[in-house]
């Protein structure tokens, strides 16, 4: 007698259910996707006990006649795929034809459906994979599927189910994902008779995103839409002012299908680099569209993962689209424009968009410490040409006075240039007044750090970081671990603008450093850089890590808290901030600016 034999169909379906039916939420996903493929415009989902007692999905789609209803319960029977060529370009949500029979094999299953011809429909009942009653039923066009007593015949599976409240949460998340994918379709979800989600058809993606992400996130949503090659990325992303503790609030869809893709999520996170605090994640709803034959959706039992023909193309499209939207988004209000005589402000009180300043204003960004080495170092720096820098503790280009004549360079236009500088508080914060009486508080270290980081990053991308050579090398001694990492990463250090070489033991002779970092404590800076390089693998990961390395350099060079800043220096900083992107956050994600409106101030002191 042969030891190998063909399994009976019922057991085959139960094995398939182990892949397709992970929990009640999996059933909801499969049935709702079938409804969407059937052209439904309204879908209702009802669950009891988290879906373990009942899952009901009703739709107004195309429905089926008696013959198709019976065929739909056969394994690998489908209307969505006919040949191998179709498998290479799948445009429907489902295509394998195994979900419905798998679900029916582990539940008490009932299907009511009608194609809408004279109200005549068909009812099919199945219990544990065994066909029961097949009878006519009167009903409107569409399909209703009821799944009761899930895993009643496979108690080993049922004992692994979580509490009903946990399973209900998974069902809710599954419906939210499907509702986000199709704002043109109405969705309702009831759990235990209580309405959990009601999303009307045609309300728009912003409304759906607000329901999924919450009211606070809805306030910070920004539109994104761009195409790179064959890949289009569009949707909504929250500004850095709203972030999440995990990455679960970032919904990614590929050709309308929700997917989990680490590389795609990393592309979005990388676009937010320097705008979010450590450990925080972006939120949003993003759609990736590309030709069907450029993505394989047949790689995961629940179709939650996909494989791209050109993964780098998708990564770049996501990164550049999101980064571009963040760069151009109005994090802060634009500078109010004076209205012509006889005209009031723009309707609705909306700010007028003002383009960022160009290269003239960008010259202000080279605000750095005086070019002098630490005492006792024995190093001497090449000094800039006389008159190019102001004297004093901090050096920065002096803008021409307002009455300097017709050749005077125009002041930058923008939010910060429109502020009136009031003074410094606690030797850490710059206090300014905005038009309308709003009090603006600026963190002097965070803002200067962002400005220096911007300049370093732009110079790094262009491979032309200005280097200040030392007349005599400066010798620094580092901790052993940092010294080893720095010696292994001398090539990367050179790309950052440092000219250094080993000098025996844990010492290095530094012959030059980036000009923007003149006067910093090289030992402390190189120790930090060495610690970061120790965590970086050679190769492509180094490029990702350069953001952190440049941020560290900017942090060491920026003006500190508890440090005096003159009005001229404060004004130069304000003018320079308008010429850079991501001005509302430092490279480590901390806020740069805080506003207190006059109305809020008056409420706090009892004037309102």
From Swiss-Prot:
A Pfam family per the record: HATPase_c_3
HAMAP family with a match to the protein in the record: DNA_mis_repair
UniProt KW keywords: DNA damage, DNA repair
Family: Belongs to the DNA mismatch repair MutL/HexB family.
GO biological process terms on file: mismatch repair
Name of the protein: DNA mismatch repair protein MutL
Gene Ontology CC terms, in alphabetical order: mismatch repair complex
Superkingdom of this protein's organism: Bacteria
Function text: This protein is involved in the repair of mismatches in DNA. It is required for dam-dependent methyl-directed DNA mismatch repair. May act as a 'molecular matchmaker', a protein that promotes the formation of a stable complex between two or more DNA-binding proteins in an ATP-dependent manner without itself being part of a final effector complex.
UniProt organism field: Anaeromyxobacter dehalogenans (strain 2CP-C)
Record-linked InterPro entries: DNA_mismatch_repair_MutL, DNA_mismatch_S5_2-like, HATPase_C_sf, MutL/Mlh/PMS, MutL/Mlh/Pms-like, MutL_C, MutL_C_dimsub, MutL_C_regsub
Gene Ontology MF term list: ATP binding; ATP hydrolysis activity; ATP-dependent DNA damage sensor activity; mismatched DNA binding
